[in-house]
Amino acid sequence: MSMEHKLGIVTAGSLNKGIEVKLDGAASIEDMAVGRYVTIEGHKRRFFGMITDVSLGVTDLALTVSPPSGDDFLSEVLTGTSAYGSLHVAPYLTIGGTETAVDGPQPVKTIPGHFSPVKEASAADIELVFGKEDDKKFWIGNPLDMEVKLCLDLQTLARRSNGIFGKSGTGKTFLTRMLLIGLLQKSAAVNLVFDMHSEYGWAGTFEGKGRKVKALKQLFPSKVAVFTLDEENSKRRGVSTDYVVRIGLEEIEPEDISLLRQTLNLTDAAVEAVYQLRRHYGKGWFSAAEGIEDSETLEELKIHESTFQNLRRGMNTIRRLPFITPNAPGDVVDSILKYLESGKHVVLEFGRYTDITAYILVANLLTRRIYASYRDRTEKAVAADTGYPTPLVITIEEAHKFLNSGVASQTIFGTIAREMRKYSVTLLIIDQRPSGIDDEIMSQLGTRITCLLDSEKDIDAVLSGVSGKNELKNVLAKLSARQQALIFGHAVPMPVAFTPREYGSNYGDWGEAAAKVSDEEIEDLWK
């Protein structure tokens, strides 16, 4: 079927509920698929929309009681007339008119008239709406059942915090790796990746096939630094690392322990005791607490003995982490900042230390200090109206552990998400349980990319606050279990279901070919 082939005509609809399209007899309903694009030719403008449902209808209910069973000729005569197929189309954009000539496709504010012809969207239509691949736009894949490139403006993406969601095994890691490569290629931002399963630094795994694929350091050796918490594991995997991370006890703050309350099974009283110890002993509170053996000291601190024993068990869990030392040999935050300030991207691999305690502690501790540095630099840049820091995207996995309703208001990650791009720092969060993330945080995400989700709660959470939620629910529910995703939000003019581009067999289009961004462009990006 030609891409310009007429599919049918508009028969009913509304702006809020969508448009009903009656298929022509020549158009096979089996060729129609939820998530595909169509254009509607109105009298004054064209409308660009997405198929959100496919159905069958009849003009005479008697046909459903006495269908022409076994009579191919009669079936052919009735199909398209008395019996027909219908499409439900959600209109998103208008193309044409004086506004479009100046500003491009516009959000839809009206609907086409009765009997307006409906066609499949062409490659030219997709390029008009989403743009062509260039020095700013990055090719992320293809719209469902189309060969045209779907491109994303990564500088626009990096201006807000974003999320990648999907149940286990649907391709979240692949999509994350692809977006990180895009941010590198287009120099849209620098990345700090807290890499729980060592997928983004030197090499990753090809989901579903088990084989290794190149990750950021191999593709961009001069632009990526790999930090590791587990030097032995990195050497065994043949990874070229730039820094071995050690965390000193004096770097641990009460906020870090508070975030670990559930993980360490701490009581509220035990968390409050941490703040009391910090006030009394200062930065050396952790070591001082380890040395407390008598009840008199606890009485002086107004800490109950059972509370202290609960806290000590949690502290012992942290103390046993191999990368925790009494005195760190160097300042890891200063080292990370030096790389970021020079335009290099940092991937922190956790190696064998994939326990959630280690991940939450390290990610929160480092992010808090890095954010403070970016805040100071941005405030100075605003005062001087120059020298803005390069936008920083911080990537975290298992995001619901940092951003659930119980802790989101207290963590640095919640602060970053709520402030959007105020201090040149945004988040890229990856999670298979979006329902576990605080509603306010979800509402602050600029762009969401979601693979297949099973739970109704997760689907509702990822689509919360989105116009046309029910229609997108149908699209999301029909995605394949692998290699299909739905993207919507700030960085795209309208939702689009797509197949991500191929990665892992040929790296010719993925390597070190990024154009550099000037200081003026960086300043413009954050104004």
Placement of each model-derived feature along the sequence:
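Basic- and hydrophobic-enriched, low-structure N-terminal and domain-boundary segments
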Residues: 1-165, 174-179, 386-388, 409-410
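Conserved nucleotide-binding/hydrolysis micro-motifs of P-loop NTPases
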Residues: 47, 55-57, 93-96, 197-201, ...
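Conserved P-loop NTPase motor module
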Residues: 482-527
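Conserved catalytic network of the ASCE P-loop NTPase/AAA+ motor domain
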Residues: 156-157, 183-187, 217-220, 339-340, ...
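P-loop NTPase motor domains
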Residues: 198-210, 227-415, 481-491
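Loop/turn-to-beta-strand initiation segments
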Residues: 188-192, 342-345, 389-393, 422-428
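Glycine-rich phosphate-binding loop of nucleotide-binding enzymes
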Residues: 135-228, 439, 487, 508
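Conserved ATP-driven motor cores of ASCE-family P-loop NTPases powering translocation/secretion/packaging/pilus
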Residues: 78, 417-499
